[in-house]
UniProtKB/Swiss-Prot annotation:
It comes from the Viruses. It comes from Influenza A virus (strain A/Equine/Switzerland/137/1972 H7N7). This is Hemagglutinin. Residues 1-18 form the signal peptide. It is found in: Virion membrane; Host apical cell membrane. The gene is HA.
Length: 570
């Protein structure tokens, strides 16, 4: 009887062998690991780097109006030492300073020089206007061997005013300049500190010297400080330069009685530019928007780990050398053991015997899309990508990199650490602030990428679930889920039928009658097979009972005939 039941079950199963369609996603043998908010080292099919590490060791100047100052320092273009004669007026949107560049010829310094340097780097170049000062009773041709052209000379944009004769009286003078332009004027003047009191008397006469400068927003008095100093360029004296930005229609006035280095022309800024100090070679064959001391950063990535002091349209500097952004779904490759099992089970159970669909494993080789189908029917086996769900995921993921760039990119200004002693505290604050910003953005970068990665993985899982639900709603009672991402179909489903499931045009009513009949047969087989163990145990029990009954009957007959005696002892 058991044999009959087993044969019946096998026969019924063979008769109603179901066609099958499975859903899965693309997988690769070696994915890329990314970090999310909740987990580190999750493997995904695709990922892209967000931190640029490649540097172009040149200044890419193609398409730029570039000026290479060479031996001229940027501040020197405003006062005119001999090395800056060709740069007294210029126009540029990329200004290159070199380490060999010098701002001065006669020893001295600029007050608040870094602020002025930043103004000039962004200036787009400078143009000049004569201030119209005239002088009587003094010499205007002071010169020095420290500023040589063909012979001793002086700053081209300044006048060194001296007494008419050595040790002669320097008259009290007042000069004013009104800015009639529509943009601010850069006004620069100097104070000469002689190498000794005797030298000061020789140049400007005896007595205390005082220079006063004022405008509507500025007022300052200066007294020269003569005295011996170490010689530089053969000079023990110093010239300190001061400056102000004079608003339109405002007037600056100078009152002095010696030791005054007078401005000859006012400077006006032309527009906007980038300025960088670098010794990298200029290259007119490449384009760039982000520069640093070592060259150019050409990148569409949101972050860079090349130089924390890059300027221009630059990726944000972060401490991390790599931050991978997921652009594909979670990768669950078929390992070697799984592949061997798949091959073994295919021989026994067909294409889907060991494939666990999107729940346990992806499908390697699904190159036409992220999500897809595999089917098995009387016509054979096949695989197809689902373009709609794939495109839906891609549309939402595309632009992640651009969104990160929008959140992080901005113009950066470079503040060098060329501070004098008075400015060192300011320099320390700037450096501390820069370091703090790097720390904050390094954390922000890691957080932003982790958030996007979490969203990508959740999104791709969601699209997979949507695809699965779409198939389930179409098939309804015509198929049964096997828990592994597959549906056993209870009717004959040829390739056109499979295509209709993929295209969301499947008509479940068309196959309903056949599916119900086949489902009843399969359910009957499952029901009968379920009682097999019960029947086996019942047969075993009945056999034991029959054997015991026969033994008792034989014993009774033997006792009755005297062939067996039973003695009970107490």
């Amino acid at each position: 009887m058991n044999t009959q039941i087993l044969i019946l079950a096998i026969s019924a199963f063979l008769c109603v062998r179901a066609d099958k369609i499975c859903l899965g996603h693309h997988a690769v043998s070696n994915g890329t690991k990314v970090d999310t908010l909740t987990e580190k080292g999750i493997e995904v099919v695709n990922a892209t780097e967000t931190v640029e590490q490649k540097n172009i060791p040149k200044i890419c100047s193609k398409g730029k109006q570039t000026i290479d100052l060479g031996q001229c320092g940027l501040l020197g273009t405003t006062i005119g030492p001999p090395q800056c004669d060709q740069f007294l007026e210029f126009s540029a949107n990329l200004i290159i300073e070199r380490r060999e560049g010098d701002d001065i010829c006669y020893p001295g310094k600029f007050d608040n020089e870094e602020t002025l340097r930043q103004i000039l780097r962004k200036s787009g170049g400078i143009k000049k206007e004569n201030m119209g000062f005239t002088y009587t009773g003094v010499r205007t041709n002071g010169e020095t061997s420290a500023c040589r052209r063909s012979r001793s000379s002086f700053y081209a944009e300044m006048k060194w005013l001296l007494s008419n004769t050595d040790n002669g009286v320097f008259p009290q003078m007042t000069k004013s300049y009104k800015n009639t332009k529509r943009e601010p004027a850069l006004i620069i003047w100097g104070i000469h500190h002689s190498g000794s009191t005797a030298e000061q008397t020789k140049l400007y006469g005896s007595g205390d010297k005082l220079i006063t400068v004022w405008s509507s927003k500025y007022q300052q008095s200066f007294a020269p400080n003569p005295g011996p100093r170490p010689q530089i360029n053969g000079q023990s004296g110093r010239i300190d330069f001061y400056w102000l930005m004079l608003d339109p229609n405002d007037t600056v006035t100078f009152s002095f009685n010696g030791a005054f280095i007078a401005p000859d022309r006012a400077s006006f800024l032309r527009g906007k530019s980038l300025g960088i100090k670098s010794d990298a070679q200029l290259d007119n064959n490449c384009e760039g928007e982000c520069y640093h001391i070592g060259g150019t950063i050409i990148s569409n990535l949101p972050f860079q780990n090349i130089n924390s002091r890059a300027i221009g349209k630059c990726p944000r500097y972060v401490k991390q050398k790599s931050l991978m952004l997921a652009t594909g779904m979670k990768n669950v490759p078929e390992n070697s053991t799984h592949k061997q099992l798949t091959h073994h089970m295919r021989k026994k159970r067909g294409l889907f015997g060991a494939i666990a669909g999107f729940i346990e494993n992806g499908w390697e080789g699904l190159i036409d899309g992220w999500y897809g189908y595999r089917h098995q029917n009387a016509q054979g086996e096949g695989t197809a990508a689902d373009y709609k769900s794939t495109q839906s995921a891609i549309n939402q993921i595309t632009g992640k990199l651009n969104r990160l760039i929008e959140k992080t990119n901005q113009q950066f200004e470079l503040i060098d650490n060329e501070f004098n002693e008075i400015e060192k505290q300011i320099g320390n604050v700037i450096n501390w602030t820069r370091d703090s910003i790097i720390e904050v953005w390094s954390y922000n970068a890691e957080f932003l990428v982790a958030v996007e990665n979490q969203h990508t993985i959740d999104l791709t899982d969601s699209e997979m679930n949507k695809l699965y639900e779409k198939v389930r709603r179409q098939l309804r009672e015509n198929a049964e889920e096997d828990g592994n991402g597959c549906f056993e179909i209870f009717h004959q489903c040829d390739n056109d039928c499979m295509a209709s499931i993929r295209n969301n045009t499947y008509d479940h009513k068309k196959y309903r009658k056949e599916a119900i009949q086949n489902r009843i047969q399969i359910d009957a087989v499952k029901l009968s097979s379920g009682y097999k163990d019960i029947i086996l145990w019942f047969s075993f029990g009945a056999s034991c009972f029959l054997f015991l009954a026969i033994a008792m009957v034989l014993a009774f007959i033997c006792i009755k005939n005297g062939n067996m005696r039973c003695t009970i002892c107490i």
